[in-house]
């Protein structure tokens, strides 16, 4: 009887994987699926499979060897591999993809969710975005930078099945590790309102030094000169900002660097889904950026 239960479970698991693969393929091909319909399908699948899962689950036997638990881990690895393939295909399906994305939290009445922001960062990594800036005007994420990094690494392992210890990390554009976190193949910078102001102050100081050294004249200060001083750290300006919350403002997020940035507003970052995230990417890919013209 146990063998029959296991066979039924394997068949249902295979059907579920096939359903997800077909859904991903159709969404990439047509791009018009309603994400609410997907949520309903997932909820229905969970409702159907949950009782069976409880039926098939066996109580752990005392002294049983750990090798009997390899099947769930194998299933997790398969799911992670499926996620990687699906999300990478999503990124390649877009006409254009932001190189640098900003995540700006403007919600003031709710505590920010580290797990939801970590999910967004991992999704960015999966679709191929290279730089992420995480910002909240209260500086909560920056004060708890280590906690955010731990959550990102945890989500990376769970969603993508990647072990960050296998990669050689490099911190983006700073010598201060306390100001930044790094995810494999993705530079993540955690910012607060002081960072944007500090960048402008440093750029002004650098220009004054150039004038004092007679390498520049005071009249040489213009938009292009200031832009070059601010971008000298090697990180490109944000191409896209996802602003979460009802406030119609970025609340001091890199004021100079977002002159030409596309901004997409979302109601909240809490419980955000991958479909919401990818919908914002599709909106960015479809927009025509005039670059100030």
Swiss-Prot record:
What reaction(s) does this enzyme catalyze? n isopentenyl diphosphate + (2E,6E)-farnesyl diphosphate = a di-trans,poly-cis-polyprenyl diphosphate + n diphosphate
Phenotype for residue 292 to A:
Almost complete loss of catalytic activity
A GO term from the CC aspect:
endoplasmic reticulum membrane
Q: What biological function has been recorded for the protein in this entry?
A: With DHDDS, forms the dehydrodolichyl diphosphate synthase (DDS) complex, an essential component of the dolichol monophosphate (Dol-P) biosynthetic machinery. Both subunits contribute to enzymatic activity, i.e. condensation of multiple copies of isopentenyl pyrophosphate (IPP) to farnesyl pyrophosphate (FPP) to produce dehydrodolichyl diphosphate (Dedol-PP), a precursor of dolichol phosphate which is utilized as a sugar carrier in protein glycosylation in the endoplasmic reticulum (ER). Synthesizes long-chain polyprenols, mostly of C95 and C100 chain length.
Short motif RXG motif, span: 290-292
One matching Pfam family: Prenyltransf
Q: Which UniProt keywords apply?
A: Angiogenesis, Congenital disorder of glycosylation, Developmental protein, Differentiation, Disease variant, Endoplasmic reticulum, Glycoprotein, Intellectual disability, Lipid metabolism, Magnesium, Membrane, Metal-binding, Receptor, Transferase, Transmembrane, Transmembrane helix
Q: Mutating residue 197 to A: what's the consequence? A: Decreases binding to DHDDS
Instruction: Write down the membrane topology.
Output: Multi-pass membrane protein
* pH effect on activity, per entry: Optimum pH is 8-9. Active from pH 5.5 to 9.3.
Disulfide pattern: none
- Per UniProt, isopentenyl diphosphate binds at 291-292
Q: Which residues cross the membrane?
A: 1-23, 35-56, 117-135
Domain notes from UniProt: Contains the RXG motif, which is important for substrate binding and prenyltransferase activity. The catalytic site at NUS1-DHDDS interface accomodates both the allylic and the homoallylic IPP substrates to the S1 and S2 pockets respectively. The beta-phosphate groups of IPP substrates form hydrogen bonds with the RXG motif of NUS1 and four conserved residues of DHDDS ('Arg-85', 'Arg-205', 'Arg-211' and 'Ser-213'), while the allylic isopentenyl group is pointed toward the hydrophobic tunnel of the S1 pocket where the product elongation occurs.
| Compartments where located | Endoplasmic reticulum membrane
Q: In which pathway does it act?
A: Protein modification; protein glycosylation; Lipid metabolism
Protein family (similarity comment): Belongs to the UPP synthase family.
- Record's subunit section: The active dehydrodolichyl diphosphate synthase complex is a heterotetramer composed of a dimer of heterodimer of DHDDS and NUS1. Interacts with NPC2.
Gene3D superfamilies noted in UniProt: Decaprenyl diphosphate synthase-like (3.40.1180.10)
Name of the featured protein: Dehydrodolichyl diphosphate synthase complex subunit NUS1
Which Gene Ontology biological process is one annotated for this entry? cell differentiation
Cofactors, names only: Mg(2+)
**Glycosylation site list:** 144, 271
